Amino acid sequence: MTDTRKSPEPGVKLRAADKVARIPVKIAPTEKPLRKPAWIRARTHGSPEVQRLKRVLREQRLHTVCEEASCPNLGECFGHGTATFMIMGDICTRRCPFCDVAHGRPEPLDAEEPENLARTIAAMGLRYVVITSVDRDDLRDGGARHFVDCIRTTRAHSPDIRIEILVPDFRGRMDVALAILNEAPPDVFNHNLETVPRLYREARPGSDYDWSLDLIQRFKETHPQVPTKSGLMLGLGEEMHEVEAVMRDLRDHGCDMLTLGQYLQPSLHHLPVKRYVTPEEFDRLAEIGYAMGFSQVASGPMVRSSYHADQQAQKVIPEG
């Protein structure tokens, strides 16, 4: 039967059931979610500092992945005056069923965003910032030029800042994207594999495991002095031997830093949590990671790719 549903108008956000309606592996709403164990905790989001930072972001028309992806650490990070900025809008062209960012047809890029971002970062007095983005498959360069504009403008306003970028996979656009990023390389290059290859069709429709590994390797070959980073979420049904295999693949492709955290289901329409990985298992994976040669491993139930990113980078980036 032909699917006659129309694509949403630009700017219309699809979430939950609407977002995952057309992915290859269908997801039935979760009826009985697993009970969260005692080690899964997150602070509330109602502190004055959290509310102040949210106001600043709205005034500057900026977005954070902390809010859009419903990160459980939002209260802690915002409470310390730090955030991971999400550029190029808050609508993603992908439909990954683990992610709470909305799907749809994005609006055109905001030409004022690099300046607004740079001024906000300078006003906050940040010394380390993470800049990430939604997937923009509608752009010929995947958004690489906008990343470079944001990096350059931020450095112009804050010359001593360290910038980590958490990039999409630039599907079908790797050559042009990497060529553009060469103009203003970040201080840390991060691209998340998210899960083991067996679960890609279900968890990362539209993405390719080997493509993502190649992206990390090619950036590292061009910029050997820039630390590379990737992350996995656990609890989607992967086996530990598969996780270790991915870790080995990352090392073989030049990845220096690793984050491992527990997947938490954003809504009943997202992928269910199959298992809560214990803190002891996360500690063991960290030991394995260091034995493999990773220079920095952050592994724990509440760890996220950008969580305490400044502290993760301290051991890797030499003081300038």
Swiss-Prot record:
Compartment(s) where it occurs, according to its Swiss-Prot or TrEMBL record: Cytoplasm
Superkingdom of the organism of origin: Bacteria
Co-factor binding comment: Binds 2 [4Fe-4S] clusters per subunit. One cluster is coordinated with 3 cysteines and an exchangeable S-adenosyl-L-methionine.
Cytoplasm among keywords: yes
GO cellular component: cytoplasm
Gene Ontology molecular function: 4 iron, 4 sulfur cluster binding; lipoate synthase activity; metal ion binding
UniProt-listed CDD domains: Radical_SAM
Record keywords, A-Z: 4Fe-4S, Cytoplasm, Iron, Iron-sulfur, Metal-binding, S-adenosyl-L-methionine, Transferase
Enzyme Commission numbers on file: 2.8.1.8
Pathway as given in its UniProt record: Protein modification; protein lipoylation via endogenous pathway; protein N(6)-(lipoyl)lysine from octanoyl-[acyl-carrier-protein]: step 2/2
The protein's name: Lipoyl synthase
Annotated gene: lipA
